[in-house]
Amino acid sequence: MRTDYCGAINTRHLDKTITLCGWVHRRRDHGGVIFIDLRDREGIVQIVCDPDNVAAFQIAEKIRSEFVLAITGTVRHRPEGTVNHGILSGEIEVLVNAIEILNPSLTPPFQMDDDNLSEAIRLEYRYLDLRRPVMQRNIRLRHQVTMAVRIFLDQHGFIDVETPMLTKSTPEGARDYLVPSRVNAGHFFALPQSPQLFKQLLMVSGFDRYYQITRCFRDEDLRADRQPEFTQIDIETSFLPENEIMGMMEDMIRRLFASVLDISLPDPFPRLSYADAMFLYGSDKPDLRVPLVLTELTDLMQDVPFQVFRDAAQKAGGRVAALRVPGGGELSRKEIDEYTQFVGIYGAKGLAYIKINDLTKGIEGLQSPILKFLPESVVQSILERTQAQNGDLVFFGADKAKVVNDALGALRVKIGHERNLATDSWQPLWVVDFPMFEWDEEEKRWQALHHPFTSPSQGHEDFLTSDPGKALSRAYDMVLNGMEIGGGSIRIHRQDIQSKVFQALNISDDEAKLKFGFLLDALQYGAPPHGGIAFGLDRIVAMMTGADSIRDVIAFPKTQRAQCLLTQAPGAVEEKQLRELHIRLRRTENTNN
């Protein structure tokens, strides 16, 4: 039916008779000649319907937007002055010999070139939204990414192995999606949050290099850019230390960006410890495009009269830090108030500042409500440490370290981009040496910072029982432009160490055996040292395409309320289906009636 793609036609096809199939992007009637922009996945070509061809012209008069057509015609040069350099086929046009309407179309609810559509309309008519060139490009680039990954991993001896989609619920962290079993009444499968345990079992089984591009599921409260089902590039390997795994994986990402975007990423990627990342950037996923850093001031503030700073400096786990904003002296009171409101989102109770007007005048050359509470020697030390210059502004954070890091870390990125201080570049790095655990104030117990199968750093095994807060892990995260795109670790391959981690997490032996007994058993049968990583495919593709949301790089995504506007899922089911599954719904009464 078709000899060529619309977007692939160019001057090489001159004087050839071709057959094209596609959708009517636009139809124009100019002085009795009908022009049709015909679109397919490769692009657009201009079709010319001359009234001398009566049969074809009569059909062309009936054609409207989004009709799907088959057209046979002859390729010719466009007339002088009508060349369109904005499209690949812009030097030629196709003079119609014959047209067939393969299927008409209702009037679409939106134009395919409308860039101001509401997301609700786009998702409701996703099959039309996906026709838009930008969505075609996004989904095809996603395909290029997965193909590049598969080729790289195949070349490095990795085997694609599928793991179960129906598995056991082990609720740690996010909630599982549960699937009732009809044949095992009262029992439920869970959809996997990751293939973590199965890929470790594959290492025990001797498949020493595994990968899978797989769907994962988390029934969590959706944040701005999360999906209940998402895609991971899941990788595991045996007998390699973390340095070799990290080297191989950054090589894969470098090749990916080179082949898909023709972009050269640094070689090697910088590495930063978790402690240094928090100290300098207030974040374990720092955006290195922003050149600003935090400056430590806790030691300076131990005895200052300013109580807000002094209390934070003296309390265990407190921090006082500064953020210098080059040229920030021009910020208005209104802008400073807006930044103060912004850091409040992260728990900060205020945002003190000093404007540097003229360093040669000493204190008189500074402007701030807090100067009267700070000794001149302390102010001088602040200026020296921050390397403040005339015209700069220094913001301060003083609170628990987490609040200061979260608030100033987010403010650093916001100011960096809003004030055009960030570079237009790709800045990857590895963050390493994470703590094994973090303390949960609500539950009053330790929780795994990554997951409970992460190996402690060498020499830190004894901390698991004596002082879990001191234990570091063999975890590593790949960060790109302030986004975590991959997270991995060396896993625990000894049953005794795994049991100690469960104990540190307050998981009893009985609970561990019930949830993870199969893993604990497997570790006793010659489990090899192993480790791996999982990359977020949706996130990587969104960054590569410049999409505002991962929903723009997923063919059929859910909304922020975990709903599919196209199919109206999730939906109610018939009572008969519930009975077959041995499920009875408990309906809550409306107490307002």
Curated annotation (Swiss-Prot):
Q: Reaction catalysed by this chain? A: tRNA(Asx) + L-aspartate + ATP = L-aspartyl-tRNA(Asx) + AMP + diphosphate
Q: Which InterPro entries match?
A: Aa-tRNA-synt_II, aa-tRNA-synth_II, aa-tRNA-synth_II/BPL/LPL, Asp-tRNA-ligase_1, Asp-tRNA-ligase_1_N, Asp/Asn-tRNA-synth_IIb, AspRS_core, GAD-like_sf
Query: Which intervals of the chain are annotated as region Aspartate?
Result: 196-199
Q: Does the keyword RNA-binding apply?
A: no
The beginning of the lineage is:
Bacteria, Pseudomonadati, Pseudomonadota, Betaproteobacteria, Nitrosomonadales
Q: Which GO terms describe its cellular component?
A: cytoplasm
Family, as annotated: Belongs to the class-II aminoacyl-tRNA synthetase family. Type 1 subfamily.
Q: Which Gene Ontology terms cover its molecular function?
A: aspartate-tRNA ligase activity; aspartate-tRNA(Asn) ligase activity; ATP binding; nucleic acid binding
Protein name in the entry: Aspartate--tRNA(Asp/Asn) ligase
What is the protein's quaternary organization? Homodimer.
Q: Which residues bind L-aspartate?
A: 172, 218, 450, 491
Which Cys-Cys disulfides exist here? none
